[in-house]
């Protein structure tokens, strides 16, 4: 009689945590108990198969670089069982999450109407939008450095400087804040005699806003 041992087969899946679909573009490797690399590859839309791993031995699946817009997953350890069945293991990647606030100088109130743009390290536009009364939420920004730029300030506010920020390798919500100061003007009021055009003394005046609220009251002596 001749006995033939069937080779073991391991199927490794790299998936999107939010959709469950296969995630292409991640760099992965499998190492043995001694830390030697057994196989390495870049994920595609299909599961990756490895044959003839040793029964009873432990292996580790490690993500060396996540796909763009995703976070590096924790390594997975698995042991090869004595079976001809396909042994399946799945590694899931979460997405990056960034929340951007456009507020007044106090940081307490969101300001609608600002035209904002996110630029990458190559000054390429990643996303543009107009601010509202709620923070702007962005998912799947690749890990790295970015610039938040105000292209146009809301009415009554001053255009502010760029804000640089870095998207870290984490699935937690990362917050970015840009603050606008109010526009401040100066009003010069001259009260003159209609005939002589000389300044008049003893004049009182009030400065009111559009709703009639008194902003200032002065007397000319």
List each language-model region with its residue ranges.
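Solvent-exposed loop/turn and edge beta-strand elements of beta-rich ligand-binding domains
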Residues: 1-221
